[in-house]
Amino acid sequence: MPKIIDEFFTGPLLPPLLSWSGEPEDWRLTPDGLVVAPAAGTDFWQRTHYGFRVDRGPCLMTPVSGDFTIEAEVSFRPVHQYDQAGLMVRLSPDCWLKTSVEYEPDGPSRLGVVVTNNGWSDWSTQDFKGDGISLKVSRVAGDYSVHALLSGDWTQLRICHLAEDDGVRPVTAGLYACSPQGAGFQATFRRLCILT
């Protein structure tokens, strides 16, 4: 697969293929990578269990057509419950997936995948201890597989389908970070790679 993006975020500018949706007030390029500090009240979730709908947060995305794989390496300094950073693939506010580590202050954090179809989200999780992770999402014929690099091996987290994805039209894919409960969280994205 050829690479359309292979970025370590150490240069003075973001790659031209990437653009912000919900650009945060606080982001910067550093020798360690892209640092993002999302505002309080940012999140992506639709209805299920909690009853609310929220669709706002910083995403650094690019349109991608056909089959692809997107990988990212991210480290985090969480402050509040549910602080999160990872990958997102999006067709609309009612149809998307995200994978990340969500912080739990009183126990292990949650490594998981949220899949949203027809305006309803679901969340699969497993315990995670650590302050950084590599994540990967692959699209093949409109279906998705999600993996995390755990103990040196890519471990499957989820296989899913996005209802609005016909396997042909472009989706947007990239990085995201959110702070549902309060400000102060910082995520550092050390690498983003997209292969088609």
Which residues fall in each region the model found?
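Extracellular glycan-recognition regions
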Residues: 1-196
